[in-house]
Amino acid sequence: MSSALANIYARLPVSFTHGRGVWLWDTGERRYLDALAGIGVSCLGHGHPGLVAAISEQAARLIHTSNIYEVPQQAALARRLAELSGMSEVLFNNSGSEANEAAIKLARYYGYKQGNTHAHIITMDSSWHGRTLATLAATGSDKARQGFGPMPSGFIQVPYNDLPAIRAAGEAEPRVTAVLLEVLQGEGGIRPSDMAFLQGVRQLCTERGWLLMIDEVQSGIGRTGKWFAHQWADIRPDVMTLAKGLAGGVPIGAMLAAGPAAGVFAPGSHGTTFGGGPLACAAGLAVIDAIEQEGLLGNAHEVGAHLHAALASELAGAPGVIEVRGRGLMLGIELDRPCGILATRAMEAGLLINVTRERVVRLLPPLILSGEEADQIVRILVPLIKQFLAQQQ
């Protein structure tokens, strides 16, 4: 399809006209089971009545004013997020990259206020935090940074799930002010952190006076079966970032702060034109209401466990399958070879997925996914994987 669009996406040859629940329809009225949810964004699926009503009603009243005025919807969503997370304050923006950029700025400003004029942040290998220059510098992907140097300095990358490496990095660099990590790496191949590792990092940050900053852009808002994935480890970060599913498809991001990170910013130290507008925040409130009222945390946990077990059982012993892993409805199937073609083959079979880290099939279906729909994913995907592996022998 020729267009005036910048050539930055390797798009699949399909476009969709409408959706309902976990299903999408293309221009030829063919139906697809959406097991990707816009890469974890459409957490309520498509056409959710409560979300549609909230967006429609708010759009009819007021779409945008400015953050130089009070925004009641913004204040209401901030209160709900604070209640759910135990955090103290919320800064809204428009995306995960912006949320993480704000977190990086906060960590540097936190250090600056303590006399550290070149604050350093410890980050993890294989991580993903965004495409702005600072978030790229924090991201554990040389490929993503290629051609965009020089990168901002002040980031120290260590192996994921390696507490001694974090401790050693802090001993080697006295200007460390924060640790930034994902509880469950998404773009990094659906790699979960150990609960003991998370608890150890929390303790280490407390001992050293560092901020623990957790990127929940992909894993937050119920995807793993709790509101936020770090809650499985029974810890609280000092900074948390959110986006993707927060407003069910309306662009929004958020940076939450607590403890020593709360109150670091002051008027003029950060800002955004569109962040936390009435429309996006009304959508965010509707998403939280739906997750609570429809029991979607429990559904994500139970249906996710069912899907995980079914995939693991059907693929057990299959040559070329390394592991099925993840939590809730954030799952990955790692193969021993590049498998990007599986996204196309699955689409041709009526299933939407994607592949990350070249050889990990990623599943991020809506939180409303039923057990029957999970079984449909298995029935379509498992034969495709086995056929692909057999052809590659």
From Swiss-Prot:
Entry's Gene Ontology BP terms: L-arginine biosynthetic process
N6-(pyridoxal phosphate)lysine sites (modified residues): 244
Pathway entry: Amino-acid biosynthesis; L-arginine biosynthesis; N(2)-acetyl-L-ornithine from L-glutamate: step 4/4
CDD domains named in the record: OAT_like
PROSITE patterns per UniProt: AA_TRANSFER_CLASS_3
Sites where the protein binds pyridoxal 5'-phosphate: 215-218, 273
One Pfam family from the record: Aminotran_3
The protein's required cofactors: pyridoxal 5'-phosphate
Annotated keywords: Amino-acid biosynthesis, Aminotransferase, Arginine biosynthesis, Cytoplasm, Pyridoxal phosphate, Transferase
Gene3D superfamilies: Aspartate Aminotransferase, domain 1, Type I PLP-dependent aspartate aminotransferase-like (Major domain)
Keyword Amino-acid biosynthesis on entry: yes
GO molecular function annotations of the record: identical protein binding; N2-acetyl-L-ornithine:2-oxoglutarate 5-aminotransferase activity; pyridoxal phosphate binding
EC number assigned by the record: 2.6.1.11
Cofactor: record remark: Binds 1 pyridoxal phosphate per subunit.
Main localisation: cytoplasm
Self-association and partners: Homodimer.
Protein name, entry field: Acetylornithine aminotransferase 1
Taxonomic source organism: Bordetella pertussis (strain Tohama I / ATCC BAA-589 / NCTC 13251)
Lineage: Bacteria, Pseudomonadati, Pseudomonadota, Betaproteobacteria, Burkholderiales
Gene this protein is translated from: argD1
